Amino acid sequence: MKERIKGRKNFPTDEVDPENFLSDDDVRNLIKDKDNITFEQNDYYKLYNCVHCGECETEEERLLLKQKFLEDGNKVDGLEDMIECFRKYRTPYPSNKMRIRRPEGIPDESDTLFYMGCLSTIRIPRYTERSLKYLLNQKVDFTILEKEICCGWPWFASGCNEEFEICKKENIEIFEEFKTVICLCPACYFLFNKYYKPSMKSTTEFKYISDYLKPSDIKKSGKVGVQHLCQLMNRGRKGVDKRVNNILSKSGYEVVEIPHWCCGGGLGYMHRTDVIEKVANKRMSDFDKAGGDYSTTYCPSCWWILARYSKLCKISPKAKDLFELLI
């Protein structure tokens, strides 16, 4: 596999945590022999090394190995607390209260639902408010829910199949009432299309918010580096990076070329946070080296990483989400 960044491995966790990295062949061999294996607590470091960027060919098999790790009686720090929050609030957080301020102009009823996600509405509300304002500015007809149920990604990516199935069942009952569901988060978009749709009675269409992006009507300027989305590009949406870059260029920005690499946020900030931080720090160095005025993205998890680590790493480009750059 050709290196996209000279001297760096394409698989992010192989780059930052090579002693615990499992290759595709390693994973396939474990799957073949899993009925004869009993995982021990120390296997956590290898099995939860993955940040779920979708770069490898064995993402689903890695999830099965996590399920077996838990079934074998092992523990993951913080997971029980997350599950308790889920039982109470249907989110991985100790609340299901949205922290967003609902902009005027969103109708109470529509055949299109904008599903924002737990991270977006609870942890990064300003990012989410700007996405709402952007859709309103584009005259998109949509509504939002008073409260959302987690899409299931934290449980799916942790190996907790029971909790994921609950999310799936309860959300399907809601989504079947809509013709279209616009997703703000690529993990939600992935789960809804691949795992929800086959179980749905309706013909609900799931779209990603990048499908609604257009060049700004106001002429913009400045150099922009973009963190494109592993969870779209590695899961069947090749070309979205070129489309977004083209929109920025037509808006007046100069797009700074930065070879694609994971930001570390694909899993969310949980479990092997030491690995996530190492990946994030390396990615911030890419933006700093490339220079420019702004660093941007159109993924909530990437934005959480970019907003946080651009400050911690004191990189030169200022972090601004794509909606802010285009409004």
Predicted regions and their residues:
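N-terminal glycine-rich, Lys/His-bearing helix-loop that initiates the first secondary-structure elements
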Residues: 1
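Catalytic cores of enzyme domains
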Residues: 4-6, 207, 212-215, 223-236, ...
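Iron-sulfur-cluster electron-transfer modules
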Residues: 8-190, 195-200
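Short, structured interface segments
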Residues: 66-69, 202-214
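A short, charged/proline- and glycine-enriched loop
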Residues: 107-112, 218-224
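Fold-independent oxyanion-binding glycine-rich loops
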Residues: 117-118, 209-210, 229, 322-323
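Cofactor-cradling patches in redox/metallo enzymes
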Residues: 119-204, 233-239, 245-327
